[in-house]
Amino acid sequence: MRILDYDKVIERILEFIREKGNNGVVIGISGGVDSATVAYLATKALGKEKVLGLIMPYFENKDVEDAKLVAEKLGIGYKVINIKPIVDSFVENLELNLDRKGLGNIMSRTRMIMLYAHANSLGRIVLGTSNRSEFLTGYFTKWGDGASDYAPIINLYKTEVWEIAKRIGVPERIVKKKPSAGLWEGQTDEDELGISYNLLDEILWRMIDLKIGKEEIAKDLGIPLSLVERVEELIKKSEHKRRLPIGPSFEDLIVGP
């Protein structure tokens, strides 16, 4: 895995947030390590008065306690918004037979609406909390948790976010907890992805950054080729999530000025 100069990485993120978020930022705080890390960095960069955290549970669990812990340790303003009645009303009016994943996407997009409503009313921007591991594999909801104005940790792998979190003082219980998108009870990222972040990041780094072939990656890591191919498939299938919508080109059909 690549080795970063973490002190300089942290300083660069702080400079980035100061430049982009000078008027203030709004962050969705889930109780997980990614959002906690962004909240800590934003508070260090801008001061607590310029950071608003939104905690938006669909159901009450320990994540809400962890999210509150982050906000209260930082001394930032925060709001707890129960999105269950909003989501349930929306689903009821859709009159569709949604599966668990479909419901999860609506939860995520509801949170996005909340974030932007608050940001717009305050003249602030939304800071995203996606990391590189999620971004490359498409492990996010399009126009949901993947939506933000700026994303300070999007070029850091999950394992690198863990390292930064430890260095900047994110509570240990948050750093060590199993990552979860909080879309249903007992849901974890690694169960859904079918691979640990430690191994996923090793594969992604070799495949994307170093451009190493699949067979060599499998041999290098001592894992089945099928696992490397599964990661490659996740990247390919989620390509549309990493760009704005595109349409057909008509440049070759121009017949006049």
UniProtKB/Swiss-Prot annotation:
It holds the Pfam family NAD_synthase. Homodimer. Disulfide bonds: none annotated. Keywords: ATP-binding, Ligase, Magnesium, Metal-binding, NAD, Nucleotide-binding. Deamido-NAD(+) binds at R109, K142, D149, H240, K241. ATP binds at G28, I29, S30, G31, G32, V33, D34, S35, T129, K158, S180. It catalyses: deamido-NAD(+) + NH4(+) + ATP = AMP + diphosphate + NAD(+) + H(+). Catalyzes the ATP-dependent amidation of deamido-NAD to form NAD. Uses ammonia as a nitrogen source. Mg(2+) binds at D34, E134. The gene is nadE. It comes from Pyrococcus horikoshii (strain ATCC 700860 / DSM 12428 / JCM 9974 / NBRC 100139 / OT-3). The keyword Acetylation does not apply. It comes from the Archaea. This is NH(3)-dependent NAD(+) synthetase. Belongs to the NAD synthetase family. Pathway: Cofactor biosynthesis; NAD(+) biosynthesis; NAD(+) from deamido-NAD(+) (ammonia route): step 1/1.
